């Protein structure tokens, strides 16, 4: 007698959220199984990969990364080049220089860059800010207004500014909004409830539940992802059924394994290869934990994770 495995799909299902417009639009979420459990049920939408484009990308030092973007001068130039990257599904514009404690770039300049990128590319666009609550609130609102009709995702609304960001981004301008918390299922659920309380539709919310480079407290991330996914699928908790997007690259490329020079750590080997390894490991860990999309940076890392996803779905 042959063995016939019993499929075990869950009663709950992750919301399907569409980003972008036209032929390049993507859908994240939509599954009713744990990550890559395709033996239990089909995953209708494979996890997606976004490419980070920072307005401080000229300071990136990895040789192959600099070579890939050689000749790029503006954010729109970087975006057009990133759109050709093998494995890329969407673009993430990261406005690091807007930080008032750093370069303090003006909101108007950032909006101009976002508009130039939107005119130059056809892939879906995700927006990341500078982590300053007041500056991000203004920046997100202005970009959401300028890119009306593009169906962008803004990362992210937080407990401190969810009313401002949720109301302007999702309600006033019809964009998708991220809900950002720090490795805590209860905080993630509470923020989703508060956004829905503003009448933001569940299918307009994407969670950013926190991440970290592997080896740097990632066990907290892993347990949070596991608990959120099990609550959403097994318990049908509608307040946790939003898809998850994990910004991997800022963490992976900021740890010592990626930043220590070969002169300082000769036994560790090639510095760029270390950074790629950290990014690949962190992205894979997030995806197997439950992330529906990851944001990455290096072409070699993106290509590796694309192959990883293709072989598992």
Question: What is each of the regions a protein language model found here?
Answer:
Residues 60-64, 87-116, 121, 127-134, ...:
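Glycine-rich, proline-tolerant flexible connector loops at the mouths of alpha/beta enzymes
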Residues 71-83, 139, 277-285:
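Short, acidic/polar
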Residues 160-308:
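Catalytic alpha/beta core domains of metabolic enzymes, predominantly
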